[in-house]
Amino acid sequence: MKSSGPVERLLRALGRRDSSRAASRPRKAEPHSFREKVFRKKPPVCAVCKVTIDGTGVSCRVCKVATHRKCEAKVTSACQALPPVELRRNTAPVRRIEHLGSTKSLNHSKQRSTLPRSFSLDPLMERRWDLDLTYVTERILAAAFPARPDEQRHRGHLRELAHVLQSKHRDKYLLFNLSEKRHDLTRLNPKVQDFGWPELHAPPLDKLCSICKAMETWLSADPQHVVVLYCKGNKGKLGVIVSAYMHYSKISAGADQALATLTMRKFCEDKVATELQPSQRRYISYFSGLLSGSIRMNSSPLFLHYVLIPMLPAFEPGTGFQPFLKIYQSMQLVYTSGVYHIAGPGPQQLCISLEPALLLKGDVMVTCYHKGGRGTDRTLVFRVQFHTCTIHGPQLTFPKDQLDEAWTDERFPFQASVEFVFSSSPEKIKGSTPRNDPSVSVDYNTTEPAVRWDSYENFNQHHEDSVDGSLTHTRGPLDGSPYAQVQRPPRQTPPAPSPEPPPPPMLSVSSDSGHSSTLTTEPAAESPGRPPPTAAERQELDRLLGGCGVASGGRGAGRETAILDDEEQPTVGGGPHLGVYPGHRPGLSRHCSCRQGYREPCGVPNGGYYRPEGTLERRRLAYGGYEGSPQGYAEASMEKRRLCRSLSEGLYPYPPEMGKPATGDFGYRAPGYREVVILEDPGLPALYPCPACEEKLALPTAALYGLRLEREAGEGWASEAGKPLLHPVRPGHPLPLLLPACGHHHAPMPDYSCLKPPKAGEEGHEGCSYTMCPEGRYGHPGYPALVTYSYGGAVPSYCPAYGRVPHSCGSPGEGRGYPSPGAHSPRAGSISPGSPPYPQSRKLSYEIPTEEGGDRYPLPGHLASAGPLASAESLEPVSWREGPSGHSTLPRSPRDAPCSASSELSGPSTPLHTSSPVQGKESTRRQDTRSPTSAPTQRLSPGEALPPVSQAGTGKAPELPSGSGPEPLAPSPVSPTFPPSSPSDWPQERSPGGHSDGASPRSPVPTTLPGLRHAPWQGPRGPPDSPDGSPLTPVPSQMPWLVASPEPPQSSPTPAFPLAASYDTNGLSQPPLPEKRHLPGPGQQPGPWGPEQASSPARGISHHVTFAPLLSDNVPQTPEPPTQESQSNVKFVQDTSKFWYKPHLSRDQAIALLKDKDPGAFLIRDSHSFQGAYGLALKVATPPPSAQPWKGDPVEQLVRHFLIETGPKGVKIKGCPSEPYFGSLSALVSQHSISPISLPCCLRIPSKDPLEETPEAPVPTNMSTAADLLRQGAACSVLYLTSVETESLTGPQAVARASSAALSCSPRPTPAVVHFKVSAQGITLTDNQRKLFFRRHYPVNSITFSSTDPQDRRWTNPDGTTSKIFGFVAKKPGSPWENVCHLFAELDPDQPAGAIVTFITKVLLGQRK
């Protein structure tokens, strides 16, 4: 039967003459029938020259093709009649515009299709499409583009899309870019937000929350607002966002939202359900479960021990199965396994063991690759993404249908699964552990690109449409192949038209108002805009999303607790515009910290911007400094994008010196560390708390959980004397890129820096020096005033105009490694009591109050019901993750922050014995001090000691003191050689009265080797106006102690490396006690001895130098009267946090400080066992009755340890229900100083720093400083072995991998004798014989780690002797994420590897923290 009507026309359009499935024949091409036409309303584009036809042109009567009159003869396309009008919609071969929930076509056609709703031409269109624009709802549009379109056509379609959106919605639409950033998106659309993530992946959970919150904020601000979701490639991203927002909007949905929810569900089922990956479905389920409360959130970190994957022997014919794993945390690579090889038929399951266990928290992605037989390619076996907040057991299993890539791979068995084994501790799991078959071998030494590539390191690092005239490429593959993709820019790019002028403010929401289910010809009435959610709905949303990192105007749960209360910033309200576009995310801020749980938002001050989640921001100094690039290091390397993410984010104020940031300065960033912003500048606008906080400020201390930081009067940094400038920051997981080389080297004012090449005839040919002299308004106690660095041995100059001697910015080093049995050096005569090494087998434990069992203290009657104190639980011993390669990129306290008020030079707490031969000739330089009145310099003879320098900055000419040189001491049997250092030129100033104001009667106890004598120091004679014979007593309250002893002289261009008294096999020792440097008040002067001051020892005399922990330089000259406990108030608690919070203190150090104190004395430190928690060490009167027998000092048993856990509500002592949450550590300390609650006794708040309470000691002879060693540098000759690329790996594992590669390669590398020099600028290698190279320099900011081989392997020399192997890890030039380990072996027995490594780690790397 012959068809008629619409069906006949449909079949004709499809090229079929009847209803049978006969093959269609091509129609005969017919000539065009052109006629002249004037184009007025919408001029088309010429079909030949692609230029818009302005005015008159020609148009074909049949096919409607348009062209210029002059181009008419050049038309080559055939003329074919268009299909009927009712069938034209959804059949265009180029782009498809579809309306779900709408019945009108985009061109306002009144004609409607009579086809049934179920009929679809989608299968015909899947072959070729360039744009798929779908109205998901009336206010949510989805714009999808193919993955790899022609770039020029793609730009044209983007312009058409922008034109359509502008014509329909004007500036009322907000475009969410879910793919890589593009310049033209920002250029063509008024408001764009970038929330991109890699294709076929699930977005981070907090990013999912952020997108939904931003959509909600935009749509609720104005009923006419529209959201456009832009996606390029797989449409699964659209499904993830639409599904997530569907669940999000149901929280506060009304009756008018039911239809929108239905259409969103219909879109997901019909359009994107088949394109969703298993991980994307999993994250949608996570999001829905967290919103509904069906998923209980687990906020504790997990340690991954094993990954069990199935064996796939037939994965690649001829090659077998060679898998390896890559583990990412928040899209940053944290682990790469070795390549596993299976010989013959092996077991059904392969066990990949992670040693040590890998700490994971947050979004985790595990990818398994198969290394190809040729070794140059790799194939993705499976990929799985999950979030640790949803894991509540020790095992996590994923079957095949939940594994990305594997779920559609027939080579992956249907019954196979992937299993992860976790625990809450890094210790090995006891009991039966999975083991591999003996036929399984592992290759850890591979350096092939297929294994090393990190496919995600360059995502969103640049704009996708960036064209700079050169080849654009990605350094790593994005599809699993080992090769980068190179794209040539188009030869001719048409100019992008400028956006249309802003339209009138009032327009209709949309012309698409009727819903397709009605099938009516008349549009229905417009649905009113959604009202903004009520306060109750917002609170409910906050409660549900509290743990996800984003709340409805509140701060997330991931933010760590501050030592001092935050001056919280209020939230943004939903208004007609958000003021953060383009490029920034709206509506995400922090709550005031006054209330527990989830609170309502407060008002917001002006002048802030939101730092979007999942973005990478170029770091700026909040106090007005600027990033600078050191000499000899490219600026691009200085601005390495440090991947950071925080589960909480808030409003950031613009520093006054910077102004508003430029748009588009954000890229993708993966999590790792919490952001810290300094808000102490008095010039910043005040941030007011909510009214409830202001009322609580008037309450007594005991009633406050959140305490406010009071400011003192003053100017500049002196007004903040003694106050922490940063809140403590908690790293969430171990990362391989850890030291400030990742973009944290800041110069105060690069505008004032100048490069000075070496003058003719001067030494220092190894590099040129540079000078920085910032203005006073950029002053910071931790920054140099005028510091001259040089590769040679230049002496820093002093800038009297700046009023401050240069300070080195240092912090306690945290170098630790794997101690090996019997690895102590013969020189290790003693160990500093300040930093005892951890015994290998010792377990650490905390006392956690619980309801039943464990250690019990007799409690007062009114506290008896609170529950006894619980037994201690065993924790892990300290591992290498706590060292420089562990968690310490950002400072944990105000005292060791980068560029903070720290003057410590990171001298080791164990004795550092210096052997420094120096030639007699001078090698110093003079630098311009830029003083209003040039201060004359004083030349000291080698026999004179350098007098102290006044820091008053008055420019007064100094009086030249006279005196004898230092007295020699008796020889020490263990002292290595130390020839004299070179003389120095110093501008000298003397304070009135003959000696400096800051001298303190208290002094630290030097830690020396047994048998080393201490002689009284005979300083220079007093000046004429002081009593005769009274020396200027230089008590270095902030400098290391030095003890001298004579040795036969030696001669060498630079000092040798100081020999450490005690170091492990990898050359690293325990961190010193953290220093406390208090800024002087407006009327005070700092201590008399700056870091750069030192006496110049006499020629021919060697000196034995010993460093001790650094102490405060703000010691009062007269002791203050004791403060009564009852007089404590808010300000007192805030000001004393520097006395009891010691972040880098070890447990043994805390015991040593507290064991001689009265009961109630306490210290709080960062927990090394539980990341993000604190440890409370408390001295008690008697041990608990159930305490275990103690073999050591019984006094040490009186120091008990408690764990302070952190959470969304604040901090609390773990294990006791009666313990409330406190807004800060200060609040917790204040309350427990009044009432012990669950503690054995009340806390006694100290009135002074316990590190300063040391007995007086004789002043050692010949004061010298670590700064002298840095200026002169230390050098020796070593054997250079090789350099091994370690991808993103650093720390001891990088050195171990490089050592394994060097020792296993055949033939072994030929060593070369090189001159190894360490100075303030970095490490310089000079091959005197020029066999391998001439000279190589590694700037200090590129060096991330240094140690000896953790496995204590040795290099075998040709004569049969062996030498210890050591190395340092530095950034690979031109690659911000890859590292290279440079390997060496000892050459001179007097310069052991441990001494070199200790010098690098403790002095060189520590001075820039």
Curated annotation (Swiss-Prot):
Regions of compositional bias (Polar residues) in chain numbering: 900-918, 930-940
Subcellular location per the Swiss-Prot or TrEMBL entry: Cell junction, Focal adhesion; Cell membrane; Cytoplasm
Biased segments, Basic and acidic residues type: 9-20
Result of altering residue 1155 to Q: 6-fold reduction in affinity for PtdIns(3,4,5)P3 and reduced IRS1 dephosphorylation but does not affect cell membrane localization or affinity for a tyrosine-phosphorylated peptide
UniProt keywords, alphabetically: Cell junction, Cell membrane, Cytoplasm, Hydrolase, Lipid-binding, Membrane, Metal-binding, Methylation, Phosphoprotein, Protein phosphatase, SH2 domain, Ubl conjugation, Zinc, Zinc-finger
Catalytic activity: O-phospho-L-tyrosyl-[protein] + H2O = L-tyrosyl-[protein] + phosphate
Region annotated Disordered, chain positions: 1-35, 462-536, 562-582, 812-1098, 1111-1130
Pfam families per record: C1_1 (PF00130), PTB (PF08416), PTEN_C2 (PF10409), SH2 (PF00017)
SUPFAM superfamilies (alphabetical): (Phosphotyrosine protein) phosphatases II, C2 domain (Calcium/lipid-binding domain, CaLB), Cysteine-rich domain, PH domain-like, SH2 domain
Annotated SH2 domain residues: 1140-1247
Modified residues (Phosphotyrosine): 456, 483
PTM description: Ubiquitinated following sequestration in cytoplasmic aggregates with SQSTM1, leading to proteasomal degradation.
Residues recorded with modification Omega-N-methylarginine: 555
Main subcellular location: other
Effect of residue 1165 to A: Does not affect affinity for PtdIns(3,4,5)P3. Reduced affinity for tyrosine-phosphorylated peptide
Comment, domains: The SH3 domain mediates binding to phosphatidylinositol-3,4,5-triphosphate (PtdIns(3,4,5)P3). It is also required to ensure podocyte integrity while the phosphatase domain is dispensible for podocyte maintenance.
Name of the protein in its database record: Tensin-2
Organism in which the protein naturally occurs: Homo sapiens (Human)
Lineage of source species: Eukaryota, Metazoa, Chordata, Craniata, Vertebrata
